[in-house]
């Protein structure tokens, strides 16, 4: 190899880690993951190409997720789990001082509370009592962008409201057993009122959704519950959550979302996708796609130990971040979809080694960092989010890959990639509870 190439090493683990530059990749008896199967059960229509879809770097931002979850766990009503405008202003001021200087330039809402379309609007104007317009203006005044948790396949307004640019009513987009072929006829959608975008006016409905948020100044849409829309059945809940509108409707609807998001300059974050057929749709039409189940309580369990080494053919394919990044690493890279490891709650981790690990694997994989610690809980964990040496990977749009994307293989613990200046970054990740040796021959990576 070229002796002029520069290398930097990250040694990350729960315990001390040695990294001599020689090759050793014994399997330790770990078992391989199962690749996703082709789960398409209906014909997918001819779909558009969306040029220059993957031009973004992974976002660095703060999410209200932890606050919502902990308020809900404490028994608060859903509308009290959402920040008021005054609470958001306090958070934005804290962001401006503590995270914005390090590249975290966005905040994002999440899924608790009531989504309201007021004053005849077809689309959400208020999140519980939070006026989105004023919220975005307050953020913009501080140099901070806003992401909104919403989905163009959800209905928040009255049925008699007209779809923008058409004479169709929003109610005409609802499931119609006379024309919609679904997986479980008669099953109602839970939690959300669903629009079926393949009905007449559906394309205009989706385009109007993204125009609405563009006009408000929103930068990202976090689009959730994709697997419930496509399949109707949840493997985790072990129950039907909706009729399941099928692969063809999902594919066409997602393609339209991508077209409109690109048209209006909105970053499209896909959440809870099945990723069937090797993520052929999500990798094509999402700027970013989730590769692991929900953060929930955080901790090392979410990052590494939960169902370690196991994978499934539908959402979620993996139940911990490290496996998710490994499993889906082959679809990521510069000019490709961004892998999303969900929210980070550093205050839930047991020690500094764990905190270093969770930040490092996300940045090594080219993923975002979505800080979710509350101001009252973040404490000394803040410094791990402010690590300029690690954040340089994000600024450079670095995307690394494991030596081996087989779950629990020795090679899956060694990640590497190149910076734009030609230097190599190598990360050694120890997922075990005791020190261990890792070795790498530099010729292996270039």
Q: What are these model-derived regions, one by one?
A:
Residues 11-21:
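Bacterial N-terminal signal peptides
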Residues 59-132:
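N-terminal carbohydrate-binding/catalytic regions of secreted carbohydrate-active enzymes
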Residues 41-50, 90-95, 129-133, 204-209, ...:
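Alpha-helical scaffolding within the catalytic cores
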Residues 2-11:
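Bacterial N-terminal signal peptides that target proteins for export
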Residues 57-63, 258-446:
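Active-site-proximal substrate-binding groove within the catalytic cores of carbohydrate-active enzymes
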Residues 50-55, 96-101, 137-141, 214:
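Acidic (Asp/Glu)-rich catalytic clusters
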Residues 20-44:
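Bacterial Sec-dependent N-terminal signal peptides
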Residues 106-341:
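Aromatic- and carboxylate-enriched substrate-binding clefts and catalytic-loop regions
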């Amino acid at each position: 190899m070229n002796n002029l190439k520069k290398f930097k090493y990250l040694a990350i683990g729960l315990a001390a880690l040695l990294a001599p530059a020689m090759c050793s990749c014994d399997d330790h008896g770990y078992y391989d993951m199962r690749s996703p199967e082709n789960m398409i059960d209906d014909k997918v229509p001819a779909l558009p190409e969306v040029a220059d879809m993957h031009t973004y770097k992974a976002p660095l931002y703060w999410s209200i997720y932890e606050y919502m979850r902990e308020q809900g766990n404490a028994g608060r009503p859903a509308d009290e789990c959402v920040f008021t405008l005054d609470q958001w202003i306090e958070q934005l001021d804290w962001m401006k001082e503590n995270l914005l200087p390090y590249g975290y330039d966005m905040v994002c809402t999440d899924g608790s509370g009531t989504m309201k379309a007021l004053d005849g609007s077809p689309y959400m104007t208020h999140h519980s009592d939070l006026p989105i317009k004023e919220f975005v203006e307050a953020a913009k005044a501080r140099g901070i962008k806003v992401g909104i948790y919403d989905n163009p396949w959800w209905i928040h307004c009255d049925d008699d409201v007209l779809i923008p640019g058409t004479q169709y009513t929003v109610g005409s987009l609802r499931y119609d057993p006379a024309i919609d072929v679904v997986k479980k006829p008669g099953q109602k959608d839970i939690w959300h009122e669903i629009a079926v975008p393949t009905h007449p006016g559906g394309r205009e409905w989706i385009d109007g959704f993204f125009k609405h948020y563009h006009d408000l100044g929103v930068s990202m849409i976090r689009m959730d519950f994709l697997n419930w829309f496509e399949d109707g059945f949840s493997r985790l809940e072990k129950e039907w959550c909706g009729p399941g509108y099928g692969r063809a409707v999902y594919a066409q609807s997602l393609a339209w979302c991508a077209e409109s998001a690109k048209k209006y300059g909105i970053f499209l974050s896909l959440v809870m996708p099945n990723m069937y057929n090797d993520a052929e749709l999500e990798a094509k039409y999402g700027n970013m796609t989730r590769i692991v189940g929900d953060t929930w309580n955080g901790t090392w369990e979410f990052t590494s130990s939960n169902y370690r080494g196991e994978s499934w053919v539908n959402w979620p394919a993996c139940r911990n971040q490290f496996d998710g990044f490994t499993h889906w690493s082959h679809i990521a890279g510069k000019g490709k979809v961004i892998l999303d490891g969900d929210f980070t709650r550093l205050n839930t981790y047991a020690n500094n080694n764990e905190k270093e690990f969770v930040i490092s694997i996300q940045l090594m994989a080219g993923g975002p960092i979505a800080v979710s610690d509350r101001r009252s809980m973040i404490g000394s964990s803040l410094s791990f989010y402010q690590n300029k040496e690690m954040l340089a990977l994000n600024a450079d749009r670095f995307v690394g890959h494991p030596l081996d994307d087989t779950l629990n293989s020795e090679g899956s613990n060694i990640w590497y990639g190149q910076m734009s200046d030609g230097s190599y970054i190598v990360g050694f990740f120890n997922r075990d509870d005791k020190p261990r040796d890792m070795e790498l021959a530099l010729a292996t990576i270039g």
